[in-house]
Amino acid sequence: MNPNQKIITIGSVSLTIATICFLMQIAILVTTVTLHFKQYECDSPANNQVMPCEPIIIERNITEIVYLTNTTIEKEICPKLVEYRNWSKPQCKITGFAPFSKDNSIRLSAGGDIWVTREPYVSCDPGKCYQFALGQGTTLDNKHSNDTIHDRTPHRTLLMNELGVPFHLGTRQVCIAWSSSSCHDGKAWLHVCVTGYDKNATASFIYDGRLVDSIGSWSQNILRTQESECVCINGTCTVVMTDGSASGRADTKILFIEEGKIVHISPLSGSAQHVEECSCYPRYPGVRCICRDNWKGSNRPVVDINVKDYSIDSSYVCSGLVGDTPRNNDRSSNSYCRNPNNEKGNHGVKGWAFDDGNDVWMGRTISEDSRSGYETFKVIGGWSTPNSKLQINRQVIVDSDNRSGYSGIFSVEGKSCINRCFYVELIRGREQETRVWWTSNSIVVFCGTSGTYGTGSWPDGADINLMPI
């Protein structure tokens, strides 16, 4: 090969190698960019909700001939699909209840601006628990707090704070309401807020901060709802509402709601005679509620809700140790599962219970006649055996010398099971404490535990003589 041919050959080879290197660098660049965008491709969820996902740092060291490429993907916030809650995990096995939270609202009102409230409850989103109550449009140390014993005024609003944070002046007023229920479907909060005239009230359905639907009174006699959390399964939320006599036949309906819109209404069916102020919990694939019979029974009604076909059944808790107040003493009280016991049925108080196999856990006032003291216990066979009375694992939450009030259930989903928790309303002021003109409350909260626990009493604790009049 002559010198000219050698030069041409070397030049051609060099040009070919250079071309290959150039094309490879283009391929590397395209691959890197493609991987970058594929790494962060995420489906956009409905209603534009995003949750931060863990950032992933990808380092690529690619060596090609004499070129070194170091590519680092920056940290990014990636939209992650938020799913509806389905509550399909089993119920936690518990030995009793352990202290969880206490807000001390009345004690703090002696020296601070705290709302006057009643009808409190607790509900949780997937990450945090909140306390709710119906405010009276005034703080306690304020002349507007006079005569706040009345349940229904146009100034009452639903208040919402993180659990354990008393309702201070900066508290959010979610809606106008003198009766309410709230629950989180996994994507957003639903609030059911009842207000208006006794004979023509309105229930507003607020979802994700927006008014979505409403319904008017259907019996023109104090439309009212649960005063505790509703329950959502796979995007369908259920709420029990009653309109009609508080001491006679009333018209109870179960509303099915999807993202704030009423999609179905079922009438109450089964053997329950009177149903108010239900304490509901998820019992997959349905919802179960323990309610107040304010007409015939001191045994509590049970309402079973089928979320799939909208069917309803109702009965009564079988335990002969009954849960309402007033009631007969435990020796003479009865319950036979299907019907009201006709024992001191007129009047009552909101309460709760939940099934545990054939047994039942329940809470009630210690007093048989007044809203004083509070206790919890398990009744063996109390869910399935008529008039069962074998009580175990009794705990005192509030001693009998101190006032209690409404109580209700809420559910918390853990890693492997669903825990049941309850709150107790600790009422202070009128009617019993006539030194002051106001009526308000604080709360104490307990949750189920599989561990051991001690004893105590957790009353409101405010000295009424130190309180504003």
Curated annotation (Swiss-Prot):
E.C. numbers: 3.2.1.18
Region of interest (Involved in apical transport and lipid raft association), residue spans: 11-33
Activity regulation behaviour: Inhibited by the neuraminidase inhibitors zanamivir (Relenza) and oseltamivir (Tamiflu). These drugs interfere with the release of progeny virus from infected cells and are effective against all influenza strains. Resistance to neuraminidase inhibitors is quite rare.
UniProt KW Signal keyword: no
Active site: 151 (proton donor/acceptor), 406 (nucleophile)
Residues with glycosylation annotation: 61, 70, 86, 146, 200, 234, 402
PTM info: N-glycosylated.
Names of the cofactor(s): Ca(2+)
GO molecular function: exo-alpha-sialidase activity; metal ion binding
Disulfide bond annotation, renumbered to this chain: 92-417, 124-129, 183-230, 232-237, 278-291, 280-289, 318-337, 421-447
GO biological process: carbohydrate metabolic process; viral budding from plasma membrane
Keywords of this entry: Calcium, Disulfide bond, Glycoprotein, Glycosidase, Host cell membrane, Host membrane, Hydrolase, Membrane, Metal-binding, Signal-anchor, Transmembrane, Transmembrane helix, Virion
Topological domain ranges for the Intravirion compartment: 1-9
Positions of Ca(2+) binding: 293, 297, 324
Membrane topology, as annotated: Single-pass type II membrane protein
Hypervariable stalk region, as annotated region: 36-88
Residue ranges, annotated region (Head of neuraminidase): 91-469
InterPro entries noted in UniProt: Glyco_hydro_34, Sialidase_Influenza_A/B, Sialidase_sf
Keyword Cell inner membrane: no
Family in the record: Belongs to the glycosyl hydrolase 34 family.
Description of how the protein assembles with itself and partners: Homotetramer.
Miscellaneous section: The influenza A genome consist of 8 RNA segments. Genetic variation of hemagglutinin and/or neuraminidase genes results in the emergence of new influenza strains. The mechanism of variation can be the result of point mutations or the result of genetic reassortment between segments of two different strains.
Name of this chain's protein: Neuraminidase
Native source organism of the sequence: Influenza A virus (strain A/Udorn/307/1972 H3N2)
